[in-house]
Amino acid sequence: MSSIKFHEKSLKEVTRWIQANEDINTETSLSSSSDSSTTIPVIDHLPARIPYATDLKRNPCHFQKCLISRLATTKMLSHAVDGGDIEVMGMLVGYTSNDMIVVKDCYSLPVQGTETRVNAHMESYEYMVQYLDAFVTKEDKIVGWYHSHPGYGCWLSNIDIQTQSLNQNYQDPYLAIVVDPKKSLSGNTLDIGAFRTLPSKDNNEHVDYYPLNIQLYQNSLDVNISKLKLKFKVDPAIQNNPNEPELMKELHECVENWFHAKKVMKSTVGFNAIGSTVVNETEIGNEDFTHERSNSISSTSSLTTRHTTDVEMDDQESAQSSLDIPANVIPGMQFQEAEIKHEYELKKKKLLLLKVKQYQKLRTYRQLFNASE
């Protein structure tokens, strides 16, 4: 998963939010700025890096401020909008300065979310470490995580509190940011909250949390974000196809049907082989019984006499018939196998075409951003 998905829908909605924040005062309960100007302040020189001292950990409310870059808020909101009604999750990158946590950037995680919760698995942690080693400078580090609450405000649920408390105790300083994409888009104001947990008292399972004062900032390069989005228009022919998840699901079903058909054919052939063996043993027993009876009772007719060579020939014919049975596949199985294979190839070609279009889209964005420099 890429660190940010610039889908056309997300671009338009995020651009609308940026324009609204440039024209309207951003004094809200969660994202209020001490600056009286109506624009996001431009800060090219960030506060000095001051590590989190060990003696300061005794104060659970040491951190009171959170400085978030415009780049990070844009990526978080774009990721949350792209998730729709499903919660999304990502990591925050930055550093600390006295009682302030500075969030310079963020990146999304490949997690499985629902409408009410999001869970990170082992693959997500591996991706987090690999991304950190490849794209984040040594001066910066992970300072927290973010996730979305689509339509139900910015706060920490019980699971969020447990997650934040665990990470805060293990790798403090650690911050939790919650973004509500639906309220942000409907109100044209970024609905965001930053929180930290408080230690429990008397080993009580109930853990409380407190909000941090949020201030947004941008540098001189961030000012051109809106202009780049409004200036260049992506060809609709290379937009992302919303049917990609459904296509991946259908491709997976084709593979499952293929293995299921193979399994059914194998089990049926084995059953036929077992049945033929039972029939063969029964025939041999009957022939032995007839042979013994012909030896004990004298017969005047040679037609009723069975020779040992006849029994051996019968055994060979029975064994030959038992070997021929597995070659007879289930009626219609060959047609079903060919149909599944054809459907699989068709879905694979469609998915390949989608990936080619996405690659063309990424190349287009790269050319646009390089041309603007």
Swiss-Prot record:
Region named Disordered: 289-325
Binding site for Zn(2+): 147, 149, 160
Subcellular location: Cytoplasm; Nucleus
Biased composition (Low complexity): 295-306
SUPFAM superfamilies noted in UniProt: JAB1/MPN domain
GO biological process: one example: proteolysis
Keywords, ordered alphabetically: Cytoplasm, Hydrolase, Metal-binding, Metalloprotease, Nucleus, Protease, Signalosome, Zinc
UniProt EC number: 3.4.-.-
Keyword Nucleus: yes
Cross-referenced Pfam families: JAB
GO annotations of cellular component type: COP9 signalosome; cytoplasm
Chain span(s) of sequence motif JAMM motif: 147-160
Ranges where the MPN domain occurs: 66-201
Record function comment: Catalytic Component of the COP9 signalosome (CSN) complex that acts as an regulator of the ubiquitin (Ubl) conjugation pathway by mediating the deneddylation of the cullin subunit of SCF-type E3 ubiquitin-protein ligase complexes. The CNS complex is involved in the regulation of the mating pheromone response.
Family per record: Belongs to the peptidase M67A family. CSN5 subfamily.
SUBUNIT field: Component of the COP9 signalosome (CSN) complex.
Domain comment, as recorded: The JAMM motif is essential for the protease activity of the CSN complex resulting in deneddylation of cullins. It constitutes the catalytic center of the complex.
Record-given protein name: COP9 signalosome complex subunit 5
Annotated organism of origin: Kluyveromyces lactis (strain ATCC 8585 / CBS 2359 / DSM 70799 / NBRC 1267 / NRRL Y-1140 / WM37) (Yeast)
Gene label: RRI1
